[in-house]
Every structure is written in structure tokens, then in C-alpha cells.
């Protein structure tokens, strides 16, 4: 069957720079969180340049429309509108606004809201241990990820730096 692949680009060096800035200037977790969310908008646009066949979307409605009309389409999701209140006003559970949440938890949250059958985390390595909790403890995923991913049927990690694209399913 066809599947819609929805990418959320991580914050990468932009988020790392914001974290360093916060450590130096103590701007606080919530303001830093929102700066990192803005960075995700930037990295989403960078990813669109790398994947020109992908559609840039920024709402659940756009994703659902894409799934309904073009189920095999690739899209890049800019989570900023969802996280700044667009979706939480409709009753969805919001994520903590802190360093405990990264693009991993945001992707898990989106997957849950969409009723996805699986979440694939594309990483540069694989976790040492195959459980979500242990992956969080070893900083492979963020501290909130075990909560964000708790209701997902399947979470896979794929090593993009492996020639064979090795993968492992994380146990909940």
C-alpha cells in the first residue's frame, strides 16, 4: 500500500547554537524552545531545497488533504504553526515548552495526531539499547520522547550513515 512520508527536519547546528546561547546568556528554557521551533521552520525549508519533489506543509489539515488526494507524496512538515497554538486551540495535547522536547518528540506528537502506523526516526547512528526509555536515558532521543511515543504502534530508528541503512525497532 502507498504511504505518505512526512519529514520533520531536526534543528541541527541551529538548535545547538541556541542551546549554547542559552547557556551563556540564561535566556530560559521556554524562550529557547520557541527559538528552536523557529529553527525547525528554517531547516524545513532547507530540506525542501534538498527534496524538491516534496511539498512543504504546516498544518494537520494540509497533511490530511495530501494523504487523501496523493497518498504516496512526500511532504516536509513545518511544525511551528501547530506548536504555536493552531492545533492546541482545537483540543490537542500540547508538548512541554522546554529543552526536554526536540524534533523527535514533535515527530512522535504529529504521528499520534495523524494516527500513523509507524514513526521512523532517521538518525546518524542507532541506539545502544532497543527500548524507548533506554534510548532517552542515553540521549539518543529527548527526555520527553518516551511519553510522546507511548501510544504509537511502532517506532523504528534508521541509521542514515550506514550503507545498508541498518535499523532497529524501539520497544515501548
Would you name each region that the model predicts?
Residues 170-172:
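Short, surface-exposed amphipathic charged segments that create phosphate/polyanion-binding patches used
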Residues 1-168:
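Nucleotide/pyrophosphate-binding catalytic subdomain
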Amino acid at each position: 500500500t502507498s504511504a505518505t512520508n512526512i519529514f520533520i527536519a531536526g534543528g541541527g547546528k541551529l538548535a545547538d547554537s541556541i542551546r549554547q546561547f542559552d547557556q551563556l546568556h540564561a535566556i530560559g528554557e521556554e524562550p529557547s524552545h520557541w527559538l528552536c521551533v523557529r529553527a525547525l521552520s528554517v531547516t524545513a525549508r532547507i530540506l525542501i531545497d534538498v527534496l524538491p519533489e516534496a511539498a512543504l506543509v504546516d498544518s494537520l489539515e494540509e497533511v490530511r488533504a495530501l494523504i487523501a488526494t496523493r497518498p504516496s507524496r512526500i511532504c516536509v512538515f513545518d511544525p511551528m504553526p501547530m506548536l504555536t497554538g493552531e492545533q492546541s486551540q482545537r483540543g490537542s495535547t500540547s508538548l512541554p515548552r522546554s529543552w526536554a522536547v526536540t524534533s523527535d518528540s514533535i515527530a512522535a506528537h504529529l504521528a499520534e495526531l495523524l494516527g500513523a502506523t509507524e514513526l521512523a526516526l532517521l538518525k546518524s547512528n542507532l541506539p545502544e539499547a532497543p527500548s524507548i526509555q533506554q534510548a532517552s536515558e542515553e540521549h539518543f532521543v529527548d527526555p520527553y520522547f518516551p511519553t510522546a511515543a507511548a501510544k504509537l504502534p511502532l517506532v523504528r530508528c534508521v541509521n542514515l550513515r550506514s550503507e545498508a541503512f541498518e535499523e532497529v525497532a524501539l520497544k515501548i
